[in-house]
Each structure stands twice: as C-alpha cells, then as structure tokens.
Amino acid sequence: MAKKMKLSDITNMFAGMDVEALEGVTIEGDIEIDLGGLGGGFDPMLAAALGQESAVLAQHFARLAGMFGYPVGIGAPAAPAVSPALAAPKLKDLIPAKFDVANIAEWATEIQEVPIGNTSADGGSRGKRVMLGGEKALPFYFDAPMPNRNQVTIDVFDMRIGLAKAVKENYDEVMDSPGEWAKKNVEKFNADMITIHLISTDPLIKDTPAKEAAKTVEEVLQAVDVPIAIGGSGNPQKDPEVLARAAEVSEGERCLLASASLNLDYAAIAEAALKYDHDVLSWTQLDMNAQKELNRKLMKQCNVPRDRIIMDPTTAALGYGLDYAYTNMERIRLAALMGDDELTFPMSSGTTNAWGARESWMVSSPLKEDSDWGPREYRGPIWEIVTGLSLAIAGNDLFMMMHPTSVAVLKQITQTLFGMIDTEQVDVANWIGAEV
C-alpha cells in the first residue's frame, strides 16, 4: 500500500536542507482533498468549502515550487462569502390558547353518583338524601361546576371515650347517650349526616355483642332523620358480624357500612349491604393499587353495583401524612377522570384523624427550644379545618369530622367555592394595599 503524505510533509522535509534548486526530480502521486463533514449534494456551502481547500493546496504547491527554484506568486485565499443573516420576524401576537376545564379532552369520564339515605319516597325514613359524586373535573372550577356539594358527617360513639379537651367540652353532657349525641350534632352543629362508631364491640374493649350494638344503631336512627354511616371497632374478626347485624336492623335506610377492607371478610359486608339496601365504604391505606383491587373485588366478586361504592383512601394528619393523603386522593381522582373505571367513585375522608396529631391537642411542645404553639383551643380546630380543606381541593366528597367549629368553617368555605354562599367581591388587583 502506497504511503500517504501531506504536501506540508514534503515542504518540511526540505526545510532543514541547504538546497537551492532540484533538477531532474519528478514527484508522482495522487492528490486527495478531504471534505469531511459535508453532506451530499453540490450546494453553495460545498462550493465555498471546495474553493477554500483548493486555495490552501495552491499555497503548498507555490511553496514547494519556490524550494525547487521556480518561484510562483500567489495571493492569500479570499474568505468565503457569508450570506447575510435573515432578520427574525417581529412577534405581533401570542399564539391563541384557551384553558377550558369543562372540556379537557383527557377528562372524559364522570365520577359515579352515589346516594346515601332513603326517604319515604325511596322506602326509608330519612328526612333527606345525600348525593355524592358526579364530578367531571377537579373541584371548584367555575367553568366546570360540581353537581353535588361536599357533605359533612359528625362522629358519634357508642360509649364514652377519651377526647381532646377542645372537642370533649362540646359533647361532655351527651357522651353517655348516642341518640342525644347524634341529635345535638344535627340540631346544634348542622351535621349533614351522622357516623355511629360501634367501638365497644372490640373484644379488647367491652366486647359488646353484635345484637346489643345493633340496638345503638336503632337508637340513632330514631333520634335523627339524616342519613347515617355505621362504623365498627376496627377489629377484622368482629366487624363483619357487627356490621351485618347493624345492616339488618337498619334495612331500607341506605346507610353507609364502614367499612370493607382487604384485611377482613369484605364479602360478608358486601352481602349484608346488598341484602338490606345499603352502601359500602371501600377502605384502603394510602395505596391506589390496593384501592383498585378492593373496588374490583367488590364489583366483580361480590356484585356490588357501582352506585353503592364510596372510597376511603385514608386520611393522615398534617405533616408528611397529609402530603401522602392529598397526593393519593388527587392521583385517584385524576386517574378516574382519565378513564380508570376502577376508581370512578366518590371519596370519603376521616378528617377526625387530624386530632391524632399531638400538635393539635398538646398544651405546648415537649421541646424547650421549640417555638410557642399557641392556644390549643384554636390550634386543634384549625388543624382539622386545614386537613379537610386540603383534601377537598384534592377531590374529596364526604368529611367525617368532630369539632363543631371545624365543621362550620369547612362547610362555609366549601359551600362558598361551590357557589351556595354569596360573598363580597374582592379587588385582587390591589392585593398589595388590601386590608385583611
């Protein structure tokens, strides 16, 4: 294979020799011009590059000819012509765009409407029926109105329990009578619903028989005419029996049985709901995939109709817990709107769980170097309000709450956003100088 050399190599080879002229010397070879980097097609850019390379080649030959005694005059290669840059067009108008929440293409699925409570027209004795769901977008957008407002159910227990002082002072005189407790919640604190928790049935507390616990449900049904939710003690072995007996004595009232979960006999609870005309609360623990699984089993295995399922994805208190709860609920609602038919159900929040955070009820921080927490009489209700309002924005429909002030504030805010309450218009353009 012939050795390749550059013209500059030949020039450099004779540069160190005292040679004035060469006679009778012939240099033979092929000349290659490297145009690497240029694409195919002979265009003006290629022509300019080729001309420039040819000029450089001519310079090398001129220098070599001079060394051999044949000086050749040659000028420097001219710079390639540069086309003038085109001026960018001036922007006159922005690209037209419209944000229409009511017609977002990805949100093509409506949330299932689920009624709670049967009036006399429905075969029950409730004075009203609560309707949840029906949304076609995330909540509180004025251009995508919610068909049904948020509802609040206030907790009642079948025995006296330990409560935060700020809560207990509102119920102390009625805590020994579930019927009176429920009545006070409705008449004084404007509860939309009542949730009766049969916690005394827990074998580790009083182990109240299911038959006796059912009498408490009857007492509450006679005391108030709003729809009710019926909760067990949380014991996975006892709850199916307790809820089945409670469903029997409240037949035809369309109560919400709370709750079916993957760690107990959900099929027994679903069977009782179908047999005695009730709804089922599908409860999971901050896991969207588990929520899908339980909903699927209730529908496919237990044949629960879609209009009898309400989800409770779990509510954790302020802090990281609320972050998880909010994110989980928002993901569930967005997935439902985008067509996941295993998640297109209304959601319920155990907002009362806010009182499980020590910051909501402790007098002060246990850390000496910590800042002042402020009076717990205000701090606790605010804790519950913020928990509920955060989850309302995520798409929650039903709130289980305790403190009457928290109930009043949450209802006022959500009903204002819903459009039920008219408020004074505020000039937001003057936000710097506005008085608060």
UniProtKB/Swiss-Prot annotation:
Keyword Chloroplast: no
Domain of life: Archaea
GO BP annotations, alphabetical order: methanogenesis, from acetate; one-carbon metabolic process
Pathway membership: One-carbon metabolism; methanogenesis from acetate
Swiss-Prot/TrEMBL keywords: Methanogenesis
Role: Part of a complex that catalyzes the reversible cleavage of acetyl-CoA, allowing growth on acetate as sole source of carbon and energy. Probably maintains the overall quaternary structure of the ACDS complex.
Complex and partners: Heterodimer of delta and gamma chains. The ACDS complex is made up of alpha, epsilon, beta, gamma and delta chains with a probable stoichiometry of (alpha(2)epsilon(2))(4)-beta(8)-(gamma(1)delta(1))(8) (Potential).
Family per record: Belongs to the CdhD family.
Protein name: Acetyl-CoA decarbonylase/synthase complex subunit delta 1
